A protein has these predicted regions:
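Transmembrane alpha-helical insertion/packing segments
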Residues: 54-101, 145, 298-316, 323-335
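Alpha-helical transmembrane segments
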Residues: 63-79, 213-221, 279-288, 339-345
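Extended, charged low-complexity segments
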Residues: 264-398, 404-406
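Membrane-water interface at loop-to-transmembrane-helix junctions
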Residues: 204-215, 233-244, 265-285
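Membrane-interface interhelical loops and short amphipathic "cap" helices
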Residues: 79-97, 151-170, 228-241
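Central hydrophobic cores of alpha-helical transmembrane segments in multi-pass inner-membrane proteins
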Residues: 102-117
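Membrane-interface helix-loop-helix junctions at boundaries between adjacent transmembrane segments
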Residues: 124-215
């Protein structure tokens, strides 16, 4: 394993010079002394332009545009990695692909930015984020796309009839709201904090940009409402059901606003689980919740069972993982939990798309593998340094950790 380290010597402190340390399999250190201007900032290792790969160029571009990274990450997981939106449309019918991409970015991107801003400005914790994620899910799937109500909606399948009561697909609804709360909202915010640790508690938009983000979400919702109304021309959920859904979504927003920031607290100290156990717990969430309804429907179980079981399992897995995360030296565990959460979605999306026989179906999975590998290596290196009692700054995504010796 090779990694680059930057250290300061007495001469470097006087002359503002930077030292690079290279670890190899043998305990051999190699030093170099290029010029350095700012002693307080992390020291990035910049490869020559000739040796930079396309991925490295993309990483550098996204590092300088954090909002763009969040906008691409947010629909990337719930839509393109899960194959809910097909990337193969880029070849089959490009105009439709970019139309759906714009709609997804406008909907998911605006939603996650607004919820992240609420989390920071209201000084709330992850419990409030999950409640806001449920409210977002009601807006998208209920008010915009009607999948919470319409029994014959494309993605609903047999869950449009199993557990359908008073005009609502209850089993489908609870699983989908958990999915949006965790994967569409919570996970992108969580990953953003790992990729950009220096921006973890900072607002990304304010003033005019904040208002524009809210208007984008409203405009996108209106567009989808009109679009779905034209597709489902023989169905209308009715004003009463839509109004009730809006009131429920508003209630979740109010609850998130009033919930104490320490409502969901992690146990202090070191992580209680290993990274492998966190990855396993994360990988359990998707099949234990969203897939449970389909299994219960196939077994002809009473719909109340998966409805209640989904809520219990999601709450149990998430709270146990969060409380076991610890408060120090937990970066590897956070990355492992994130990878575990995404892995079953990637597998599900690949299986769902395999019949298309188009090589583009593996593109989202390749990006997931490369992204996960880079993120894991980054924080694994940082953890090794931290455990070696080196004073370090939090590394940025695509940068090597920079130890500062006392």
């Amino acid at each position: 394993m090779e990694t680059a380290l930057a250290t300061l010597s007495v001469q470097g402190l006087l002359q503002r010079r930077e030292q690079y340390v290279e670890f190899r399999d043998s305990p051999r250190w190699v030093f170099d002394f290029p010029r350095f201007k700012n002693l307080s900032s992390p020291l990035p290792i910049s490869p020559s332009p000739q040796s930079m790969s396309m991925l490295s160029r993309l990483v550098r571009f996204l590092k300088s545009h954090p909002i763009l990274f969040l906008l691409l990450l947010t629909p990337g997981i719930p839509e393109y990695l899960s194959a809910s939106s097909q990337i193969t449309l880029l070849v089959v019918f490009p105009p439709l692909f970019f139309l759906f991409l714009a709609a997804n970015v406008g909907l998911y991107g605006s939603g996650v930015i607004l919820i992240r801003e609420a989390m920071i400005r209201w000084k709330k914790g992850w419990a409030s984020v999950f409640l806001l994620g449920v409210a977002y899910g009601i807006v998208e799937e209920g008010l915009d796309l009607w999948t919470l109500f319409y029994s014959k909606a494309g993605p609903v399948g047999n869950l449009g009839f199993y557990g359908h009561w008073l005009g609502v697909n209850w089993v489908w609804t609870v699983g989908l709201l958990i999915f949006h709360s965790v994967y569409s909202i919570g996970l992108p915010i969580f990953l953003f904090g790992l990729v950009f640790p220096e921006l973890k508690t900072k607002s990304l938009v304010s003033g005019t940009r904040l208002a524009a983000t809210a208007l984008c979400l409203i405009a996108d919702s209106i567009f989808l409402f009109v679009f779905v109304s034209a597709i489902y021309s023989g169905y209308n959920p009715g004003g009463t059901l839509l109004l009730f859904s809006g009131l429920v979504a508003s209630t979740f927003v109010v609850l998130a606003r009033k919930l104490p920031d320490n409502f969901l607290r992690t146990n202090p100290g070191q992580p209680k689980w290993s990274p492998r156990k966190f990855a396993f717990a994360g990988a359990l969430l998707f099949p234990a919740t969203l897939l449970a309804g389909g299994i219960a429907a196939g077994a002809n179980l009473p719909p109340e069972i998966p409805f209640v079981l989904d809520i219990i399992l999601a709450a149990f897995i998430l709270t146990r993982a969060y409380k076991s995360m610890g408060t120090v030296n937990n970066q590897e565990e956070k990355v492992a939990l994130s990878i575990g959460l995404v892995f079953p979605i990637a597998v599900f999306g690949l299986i769902a798309s395999i019949g298309l026989a188009n090589p583009l179906i593996i593109v989202p999975d390749l990006f997931f593998i490369l992204f996960s590998r880079r993120l894991w290596r980054k924080w694994h290196q940082w953890t090794l340094l931290h455990r070696s009692a080196l004073q370090t700054t939090l590394p940025g995504f695509g940068e090597s950790p920079a130890p500062l010796f006392p």
